[in-house]
Amino acid sequence: MKMKIFYSSILFLALFASPVSLAAQDDETKTGSDCQTIDDADALKNFEKSKDRKKYDWEQRKGFLQEAIAAQPTWAEANLAMAKMIMTKAKADGMEGTYPGAIRFLKAAVDNCPKIGADPFYWLGTQYYLQENYKDAVVYLQKYIDYDTDDAKKLGDNYEFNSSQALEMLRWSKFYVDIKNHVRPFAPSPVKGIDTQRDEYLAIITPDNTQALYVRRIPVNQADRVWSSSQQAEVFTMSHMQPNGEFDKGTFMDDPFNKNPNEGAATLTIDNKHLFYTITKDGTDGPNTDIYTADLNDGSWTPIRSLGDKVNDPIYWDSQPTISGDGNTLYFASNRPGGQGGIDIWMTKKGIDGEWGVPINMGPTINTQYNEKSPFIHTDSQTLYFSSDGHPGIGGYDIFYSRADATGKWKEPVNLGVPINTTGDDVGFFVSTDGATGFFNSNASIPGQVGGYDVYQFELYPEARPEATVIVKGELKDEFGNPLTGATTVEIKNVQTKEKSFGVVDTITGSFAAAIRVSKKNDYIITIKKDSAAFNSQLISGKQEFKGVVVNAEPMKISQLKVGGAYTINDINFASNAAVLEPESMVVLEMFAAYLKEHPGMKIEIRGHTDNVGDDGRNMDLSNERSYAVFEALTKFGVPRSQIISAKGYGETKPIADNATEAGRAKNRRTEFVLVKF
């Protein structure tokens, strides 16, 4: 196991740089005090002689201490003096490192006299730490941190600095103890179809599991690229999922891609229509790596374009983008100045004008003074995976995950554990939308290895999984059945938590995709916001069993508001033969109430309708009662009574479909609002 010491030179400086720390304390060691009272005259005489540097050399003084300890093995002061002599001599001889010869004397000192001082606990804990005996390091470093005394001298000369070092060593030691005791299940296998005899890496699988994007290294004579001058060429490649559940062998990305010798590290929005990836180009100051984007319009990719000067630095490395589920936050790695260390993870948000803002550093919770890279934000938009050589780990780069709390604050990163993380560099990790499968790139010798670098998958243990997520895909139509075009917002609200998120909308085709978290079986309501558009919503019940990662919503018809127009409010249901609203219907009405309050100048009439089953008179009465129930619910949610002109039932007198079929009758059983004034 590779030990990643944050700065071993600082540790040694803290231990041994000042002669006051060790050597001078030899003369200050007292018998008795808080420790044992020694009555052995010969032992006391030898102890005193061991402190006389002028009369005796180091070997003689050591011999006197050995005789004293032999006579009184539990004598704490003598044992401590011996430990300090050993460490001081080692430093004088230029032998900075671990000092196993001192450990038994330090241990005898603190075990027989815990009040002897704080420093021996620090030295002992540090020695165990440097020897990778993390279990014992935890014990003695914790005792150093917890050392309680009113005597400042017993805390030592460098207590403030040593305390900060001890806390850091304690953090790492606890990590190593924990990771050793929690070996994670790990049975990786190659991803069929993607992996070939060639190298495949920098891979990502789209959230809907239909496509894979990666770099494939191939011989130059197959690459057919004039810019290739080496024996191998890196080609940006895409594979598609086949009906048998395997990816095809992949094809090179056509124009506008593969025009540069270094392209890849891609990410796609959840509708698979907006791609972000990395290109290295020659700049005025040499090669420069930046993030670029392209959009899929009518089956073809638009010309690639830079994310712009706000995001891309003209000098520094900007790479490895990953996009959030709503398409509005992009995370990436960069070595630009202004961060916490070397390579940091940054984020940029898309404004209402569609432009990306100035990047923000993820801060010291995620980034360290070393390097963090290879970020992957899961489709749940609240679980971030990344690689780091700064957080406690076992290799060069280890994989970590962090979760955002309800306020958006990122929690302390967690190491993914062994054997997932190795003593090498572990990067390029991502997770399936349902959260159950982890993916990574490796050229290690793993059972089933196909080529050099391959893409592997494995079942991710539950604690490290993101919240299971599905993608809701739908079509927005205008009142004539044509694709809804122009600026449109798809809002998704968690009924139970009230949390809001947004879908990705194609303003040309009217299609949309939205991510919803389904682990907690919460209900969601989708509402559409567009200038001068009538209220429209669709309820997605968390009680249903989701098969696969894609849920197809019913097409949503968005009508333009017109005075006199009647608009159905979807998902308004009542108890059988009663005017009692179902709980999920109250959610819809709460959203409709918010819509009305956003348009205070709007005045409406609520209308209730039934099918033709049953008595005509009873249907009329029931529709009246139900329309009034809707009116009461809206006023309960804060809609002024003056905004609702009336609530009236029409029974079965105004059908909009054929009552001869169940589907027709279902359409006729409806609640509408009619626009009276706008």
PLM segments and residue spans:
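Periplasmic peptidoglycan-binding/tethering modules of Gram-negative envelope proteins
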Residues: Q36, E463-K603, P640, K677-F678
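Periplasmic OmpA-like peptidoglycan-binding domain that tethers envelope proteins to the cell wall
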Residues: S388, P392-G395, H599, R607-F678
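Short coil turns that delineate tetratricopeptide repeat
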Residues: P73, P114-K115, T149, P600
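Short, conserved micro-motifs composed of acidic
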Residues: T29-I38, I116-D119, W123, L130, ...
